[in-house]
Design a protein with these regions (language model features):
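The feature marks the mature, well-folded catalytic cores of soluble enzymes
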Residues: 1-295
């Protein structure tokens, strides 16, 4: 796509063929305290010999980009900023809707100004910013489109808050969309670690992270579930990306989840990504879908 062409934007669902994705540049990425996942990494650096390696991180991120391109996905990049080392996790700083992008309000201190690089991208790309979160905090990882017209909103208190989720729910209602709000335990960070849509009517779900009424609601929405264990979920086992047409971007350490997906007939592209997962985010955290073809 040359500079004179408009970047496609807008999604009705988080399934369907992914055509355009927003990624962050990892130039200034490093480990900083973000969430319970990165807290465990810092606590175990000596006994587990965890060491951040910049060259490895750059190679792993580039390999992820190559998988997108091999699958026909156009990759767009928000600029890096030395003061925003975690802005590479573009899932959280905004989320796409049919009406334009929503700029998130991130609670964790190292990321509170991620909106600067993300909003700059939308302005330069001439993609409309539909809303800004102003009622406390809500992050893009807690916005899940179950199917066109139906959303699942999460909040843990440590990141997204109930007030933030309710603001998004109000906007959805005004547009004739349903929004179902569910609290999640803080160790899962965001709803996208708990429920990830794979294709129309099919999701990866960590049932241990959800109250029974949320499982009942998914059943009423006719969503078939592939279960993810608690053990795998807290290691970002469900944090993967549907590419559409029965293709999935996953991570190499997701042995159980990848095997389940292959048994379901999915083509699984599993990349090494530990420099980022140890820093608090997986491949789903690292992308933001700008446009998908309808299912």
């Amino acid at each position: 796509m040359n500079s004179s062409q408009k970047i496609p934007w807008g999604i009705q669902a988080q399934t369907g063929v992914l055509t355009d994705v927003l990624l962050g540049k990892p130039d200034h990425f490093r480990w900083v305290p973000l969430n319970s996942i990165s807290a465990v990494t810092f606590a175990n650096q000596q006994p587990m010999n965890y060491r951040f390696d910049k060259d490895t991180a750059m190679r792993q991120h580039q390999r992820m980009v190559e998988v997108y391109k091999q699958n026909g996905v156009r990759c767009h990049f928000a600029e890096s900023d030395e003061g925003l080392p975690s802005s590479v996790f573009t899932r959280d700083s905004s989320f796409m809707t049919p009406w334009g992008a929503v700029i998130a309000s991130i609670q964790t201190p190292p990321r509170r100004r991620d909106y600067a690089v993300i909003s700059a991208f939308y302005r330069s790309a001439e993609i409309p910013i539909w809303k800004w979160i102003t009622a406390d905090h809500f992050e893009g990882g807690d916005f899940v489109i179950i199917k066109p017209g139906v959303t699942l909103l999460g909040w843990s208190g440590d990141r997204s808050t109930r007030n933030g989720a309710e603001q998004v729910a109000k906007w959805m209602d005004e547009m004739g969309w349903e929004a179902f709000i569910v609290p999640i335990p803080p160790q899962f960070v965001h709803m996208d670690a708990v429920v990830v849509m794979l294709e129309k009517g099919l999701a990866l779900v960590c049932e241990d992270a959800l109250p029974a009424y949320a499982i009942d609601w998914l059943d009423k929405q006719e969503i078939r579930r592939i279960p993810v264990s608690y053990r795998d979920c807290v290691k970002l086992g469900g944090n993967l990306v549907s590419l559409g047409n029965h293709r999935v971007l996953s991570m190499a350490h997701n042995l159980n989840v990848n095997a389940q997906l292959k048994a379901e007939g999915f083509e699984v592209y599993a990349v090494e990504y530990e420099m980022f997962t140890l820093g608090g985010g997986g491949v789903h955290c690292s992308c933001h879908e700008l446009h998908r073809e309808p299912d």
